[in-house]
């Protein structure tokens, strides 16, 4: 493994468990696949890497393992692309008479430990560390704040481009010693 700097993002479909419980299995899997495909494309378009899909959540990273000087900007652009992709997916779902999806995206920049993780029999490229945990916690805050994209102060301070953002007061998140 190696220590690298990058921007980690998590996106999670909101209220997906009730959807799965009340939807035929084929439709639930098809909907999730359509969502993941659209989000994967948006992340890749902005030079990101999708690390894993877990349940209704997707984990991505920008700047790792391939260095990107503007990884924070790329992550915010990817999140905006994900917003547009979800809007288009929901337009298609509406035409088909299906309910709309909503999601939250958390973004955090910092150092990660990157490398192959797992067992002797099965491993995958993974990121470990506080940056990953905080990005996940920030995604969780999107529900509380009623927003679809939320970036940490560390990410915002690294931005080189201009983005319209609303500032939120710092908040404590589980597993992190200071407010973000």
Residue ranges of model-derived segments:
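Acidic/histidine metal-binding catalytic segments
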Residues: 54-55, 94-106, 148-155
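Catalytic strand-loop-helix junctions within cyclic-nucleotide turnover domains
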Residues: 61-71, 105-125, 141-145
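Activation segment
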Residues: 20, 62, 116, 159-160
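Catalytic NTP-binding/metal-coordinating core of nucleotidyl cyclase/transferase enzymes
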Residues: 2-78
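Cytosolic regulatory/linker segments at or just downstream of nucleotide-handling modules
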Residues: 112-114, 135, 141-180
């Amino acid at each position: 493994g190696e220590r690298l700097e990058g921007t980690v993002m998590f996106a999670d479909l909101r209220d997906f468990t009730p959807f799965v419980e009340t939807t035929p299995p084929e439709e639930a899997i098809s909907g999730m696949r359509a969502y993941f495909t659209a989000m994967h494309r948006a992340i890749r378009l902005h030079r990101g890497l999708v690390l894993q899909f877990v349940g209704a959540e997707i984990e991505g990273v920008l700047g790792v393992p391939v260095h990107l000087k503007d990884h924070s900007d790329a992550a915010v652009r990817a999140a905006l692309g994900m917003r547009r992709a979800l809007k288009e997916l929901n337009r298609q779902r509406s035409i088909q008479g299906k309910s709309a999806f909503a999601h939250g995206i958390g973004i955090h920049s910092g150092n990660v430990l990157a490398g192959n993780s797992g067992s002797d029999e099965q491993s995958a490229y993974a990121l470990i560390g506080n940056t990953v945990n905080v990005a996940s916690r920030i995604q969780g805050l999107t529900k509380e704040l009623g927003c679809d994209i939320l970036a940490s102060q560390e990410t915002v301070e690294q931005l080189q481009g201009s983005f319209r953002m609303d500032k939120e007061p710092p908040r404590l998140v589980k597993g992190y010693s200071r407010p973000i």
